[in-house]
């Protein structure tokens, strides 16, 4: 079990580093965010199951709900920016300010 937790933590750190490295493109940032949410889901599920927290069985499901909402908003923003400007560079998001 500790090796699984270590691997999931490394997956989260890798996705976080990917977010820092590929921050110029919106699609790459969204993929890294999804990887971070997936590793957080797996780690929270494993923690709850191994420590027998019966009162917090709904936390991973709630995390998945928020991940789905984040993905939907991110993809809507990606489609809007790419249709408006033709690129998915994050520098174009500065043009959306009022």
Swiss-Prot record:
Core subunit of the mitochondrial membrane respiratory chain NADH dehydrogenase (Complex I) which catalyzes electron transfer from NADH through the respiratory chain, using ubiquinone as an electron acceptor. Part of the enzyme membrane arm which is embedded in the lipid bilayer and involved in proton translocation. It comes from the Eukaryota. The chain crosses the membrane at residues 2-22, 29-49, 61-81. It catalyses: a ubiquinone + NADH + 5 H(+)(in) = a ubiquinol + NAD(+) + 4 H(+)(out). One of its GO terms (molecular function) is NADH dehydrogenase (ubiquinone) activity. The keyword Electron transport applies. It is an enzyme of class 7 (translocase). GO terms for cellular component: mitochondrial inner membrane; respiratory chain complex I. Core subunit of respiratory chain NADH dehydrogenase (Complex I) which is composed of 45 different subunits. It is found in: Mitochondrion inner membrane. GO terms for biological process: ATP synthesis coupled electron transport. Its EC number is 7.1.1.2. It holds the Pfam family Oxidored_q2. It is a multi-pass membrane protein. PANTHER family: NADH-UBIQUINONE OXIDOREDUCTASE CHAIN 4L, NADH-UBIQUINONE OXIDOREDUCTASE SUBUNIT ND4L. Keywords: Electron transport, Membrane, Mitochondrion, Mitochondrion inner membrane, NAD, Respiratory chain, Translocase, Transmembrane, Transmembrane helix, Transport, Ubiquinone. The lineage of its organism: Eukaryota, Metazoa, Chordata, Craniata, Vertebrata. This is NADH-ubiquinone oxidoreductase chain 4L. Belongs to the complex I subunit 4L family. It comes from Hapalemur aureus. The gene is MT-ND4L.
């Amino acid at each position: 079990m500790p090796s699984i937790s270590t691997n999931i933590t490394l997956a989260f750190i890798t996705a976080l580093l990917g977010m820092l490295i590929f921050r110029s493109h919106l699609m790459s940032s969204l993929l890294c965010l999804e990887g971070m949410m997936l590793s957080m889901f797996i780690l929270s599920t494993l923690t709850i199951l191994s420590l027998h927290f019966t009162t917090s069985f709904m936390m991973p499901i709630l995390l998945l709900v928020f991940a789905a909402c984040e993905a939907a908003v991110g993809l809507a923003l990606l489609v809007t920016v790419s249709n408006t400007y033709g690129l998915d560079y994050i520098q174009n998001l500065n043009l959306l300010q009022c």
